[in-house]
Amino acid sequence: MKFGYTIIYVPDVAASLSFFEQAFGFARRFLHESQTYGELDTGETTLAFAAHELADANFGGGHVAASASAEPLGMEVAFVTDDVAAAHARALAAGATEMSAPVSKPWGQVVSYVRCPDGTLVELCTPVHG
C-alpha cells in the first residue's frame, strides 16, 4: 500500500486551487468542469480539493467543514521548504491568516502555521534532519 492523495473539502474548489497556487507555488493539475473537484501537483503526493456537496454525498452523517470552524480542525497539511520565513510571508500576502510566526524548535526545525481562507491549517517547515 502507498499513500495516494489528500482531499480537502472546501466551499469553493476553484478558489482554493487558486489560493494554493498563489500562496505556495503549486501547479494545478486539473479542475473538473463541474467545479466540484480539482488537484494540485505538489511533487510527491497529490493534494486534492472537493466541494462540500461531494462530502455530503460520500458521508451520510455529514462532516465538519473547516471553513465553518472558528478554530482549526485537528489536522494539518505540512509543506517543507528551506525558507520558512519567505514561504510564510508569501502565504500571508496571498490571504492566509497567521496562526504562528516562524519559530526555531529545540530539534532544529523552523516551523510556522497559517490558516487558509478555506479553513485549511498549513504548517510550513524546514526538513527534519535526524
Give the predicted meaning of each segment.
Residues 121-124:
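Short glycine-/small-residue motifs
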Residues 16-21, 91, 119:
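Conserved active-site tyrosine of GNAT-family acetyltransferases
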Residues 1-5, 27-80, 86-115, 126-130:
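Vicinal oxygen chelate
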Residues 12-13, 82-84:
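Helix N-cap motif at beta-to-alpha junctions
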Residues 10-12, 106:
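Conserved beta-strand-loop-alpha-helix junction that forms the acyl-donor binding cleft
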